[in-house]
């Protein structure tokens, strides 16, 4: 009986993590230079979108000091497309910056998921 109770409590504790989406994670970043100081980003995001009430709604390109260099708004949930990749072109980045970080945002938790840092090709 004690064993059954422990299993039931474990299931109840673990259930919300599987039923409710967590934070949005960046799982991949590809970047290429398209012109002098201009870059194109292909970013893969993973988030268990549940619909319009909770979904990954944007990702940002950040300088090492935290300055936002580019924002890719995601206009709808990706419930049946996980992970998903979206692009952002025309991101101007100073020659003094050698790497950037990409973070994702969701409509409930804001930021907090996995961030990826990449070196800029020059």
List PLM regions with ranges.
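Bacterial N-terminal signal peptides
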Residues: 3-14
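Short, surface-exposed binding/anchoring microloops in extracellular/periplasmic proteins
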Residues: 22-57
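Intrinsic-disorder/low-complexity, polar/charged segments enriched in Ser/Thr/Lys/Arg/Asp/Glu/Gln
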Residues: 26, 38-40, 83-87, 99, ...
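Sec/Tat signal peptide C-region and signal peptidase I cleavage site
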Residues: 15-21
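Edge beta-strands of extracellular beta-sandwich domains
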Residues: 111-120
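Short, solvent-exposed, Trp/other aromatic-anchored flexible loops in extracytoplasmic proteins
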Residues: 70-99, 103-110
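Beta-strand signatures of extracellular beta-sandwich domains
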Residues: 58-62
